[in-house]
Amino acid sequence: MSLKKTLLNIKAFAFDIDGVATDGSVFCSSDGDLLRTYDAKDGFAIRMAVMHGYPVAVITGGSSESIRKRMVTSGVKPDDVYLHCRDKREQFKQFTEKYGLSPEQVMYFGDDVPDVDVLKAAGCGVCPADACLEASEAADLMTDAPGGKGCLREAIEKTLRLQGKWVFDPVQYKAKF
């Protein structure tokens, strides 16, 4: 199937955090919380997807509740933020079943070895420009942007534009967020 047809079939998005939504850097605060930085443009793309009815999930090995807090501010439902994942296939399956989706209808973003099986299972596996070799070989699409620097925005925007849904409605946006 061509990339265009694949993107037209996408009905949901799921992604890893470290190395995808962030650049992979983790800072440890004096109280032991693990802190990350996120690109606001990625957050806006997530909000656009949510605003247009796409389910969005986070499937990460990270375990900090600050991840959930950040993703909820971007519109992700709290119970669609899967933390402390060791076999991401399990949470990917839970997510697809919850929304009645086939794996082929989900775009999954991953950057490292623990993401490879889900990158292969998803309808469109996406990796950032700085992904490891195994992830880049498993992905259907590599973004020009590296992790934490707009890779989510790049592929989500591309998909929504192709589907005619990259449309900003300030009234709807204000009501939702």
Please annotate each region the language model reported.
Residues G32-R36, S74, P78-Y82, R89-F177:
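Mg2+-dependent phosphoryl-transfer enzymes with acidic/Ser/Thr/Gly-rich catalytic loops
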Residues M1-E90:
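Alpha-helical substrate-recognition element adjacent to the catalytic core
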